[in-house]
């Protein structure tokens, strides 16, 4: 067996500023920024245990260690790693009040999601070319980097039909660098960084008071969200299972999943190529209707109906066909 421990400390501070300048009576510019400094320190330890007592041993029997490695891909290790990041994120928003019933805006902003360390207990240490295990040096995949994004958006908000109807629209485009993608690996989720990806789309929504008692609503979205070059994505559970069978036959790939090895020839993981894969539903929307009426005794009764529709999409970042929502 094995006993695993995980501990992480995070220290962070940030400075934020935002201000608005009126260029004209109907034109204003809002600008701001956020500066963040973050430090993380992780302590990850896995001990192999005596099969009879369950007690951890710093010097496991080499045969027991070999069985653990062959069966579960797990080696005794102790990692003490730290990382720090600092990010400056500006934001700008230009708003134009064209009339009492129409407003337009254009905005640009940057953001980030901090990197960190994977907490699953089967993280493996590094190996030298001669097969020596460096138990205090983490192998590939233990740490993942910050995800950063820059976003552009333009849109409008309108009041129509003497206030009985509102209509809003927005077009957006976001570019991600080192996008963080979570993949289930059997004992937990592992986060890895994808190559650059782009997310763009158009959203429209409408609400209308059709009568004194009836209110209608609708919204529709078109989304184009694809991975860039992402040839190091985690394999699906089915692919990983097929790969184990392939390795037993001396092959290094199966079902689009390729084995990865250390310099010593030890398997250190697996990956697949999902470059250009779609990340979300291309089309989605809702339709709604609400009808209400006042009864003679002052009570209100109402009837509501909602319809939601969406295109096919993957529920997981590894684009597992079994996780397609239709």
Segments and roles (model prediction):
Residues 37-40, 91, 113, 157:
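A general lysine-centric signal
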Residues 11-19, 88-94, 140, 150-154, ...:
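Hydrophobic, lipid-facing positions within transmembrane beta-strands of outer-membrane proteins
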Residues 97, 103-113, 119-121, 127-202, ...:
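Membrane-embedded beta-barrel scaffold of Gram-negative outer-membrane proteins
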Residues 25-26, 164-166, 170-175, 192-317:
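Gram-negative outer-membrane beta-barrel transporters
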Residues 1-54, 79-80, 84, 95, ...:
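Face-selective signature of the C-terminal outer-membrane beta-barrel domain
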Residues 1-5, 41-82, 118-142, 181-192, ...:
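Solvent-exposed loop segments that connect transmembrane elements
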Residues 3-12, 23, 39-41, 80-88, ...:
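Short sequence motifs at beta-strands and strand-loop junctions characteristic
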């Amino acid at each position: 067996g094995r006993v695993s421990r995980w501990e992480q400390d995070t220290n962070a501070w940030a400075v934020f500023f935002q201000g608005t300048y009126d260029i004209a009576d109907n034109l204003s510019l809002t600008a701001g920024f956020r500066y963040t400094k973050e430090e993380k320190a992780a302590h990850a330890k896995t001990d192999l245990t005596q099969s009879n007592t369950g007690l951890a041993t710093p010097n496991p029997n080499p045969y027991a260690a070999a069985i653990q490695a062959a069966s579960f891909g797990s080696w005794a290790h102790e990692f003490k790693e730290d990382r720090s990041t600092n990010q400056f994120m500006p934001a700008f928003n230009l708003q134009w009040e064209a009339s009492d019933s129409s407003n337009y805006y254009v905005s640009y902003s940057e953001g980030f999601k901090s990197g960190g360390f994977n907490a699953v207990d089967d993280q493996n240490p590094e190996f030298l070319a001669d097969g020596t295990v460096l138990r205090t040096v983490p192998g590939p995949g233990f740490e993942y980097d910050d995800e950063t994004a820059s976003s552009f958006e333009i849109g409008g908000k309108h009041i129509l039909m003497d206030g009985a109807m509102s209509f809003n629209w927005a077009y957006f485009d976001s570019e991600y660098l080192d996008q963080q993608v979570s993949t289930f690996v059997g004992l937990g989720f592992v986060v890895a960084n994808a190559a650059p990806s782009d997310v763009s789309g158009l959203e429209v929504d409408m609400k209308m008071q059709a009568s004194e008692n009836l209110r209608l609503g609708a919204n529709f979205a078109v989304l184009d969200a694809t991975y860039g070059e992402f040839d190091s994505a985690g394999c699906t559970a089915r692919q990983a299972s097929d790969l184990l069978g392939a390795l037993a036959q001396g092959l290094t790939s199966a079902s689009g999943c390729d084995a990865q090895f250390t310099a010593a020839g030890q398997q250190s993981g697996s990956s697949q190529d999902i470059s250009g894969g779609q990340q979300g539903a291309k089309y989605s929307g809702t339709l709604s209707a609400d009808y209400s009426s006042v009864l003679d005794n002052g009570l209100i009764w109402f009837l509501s109906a909602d319809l939601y529709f969406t295109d096919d999409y993957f529920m997981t970042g590894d684009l597992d066909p079994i996780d397609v929502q239709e």
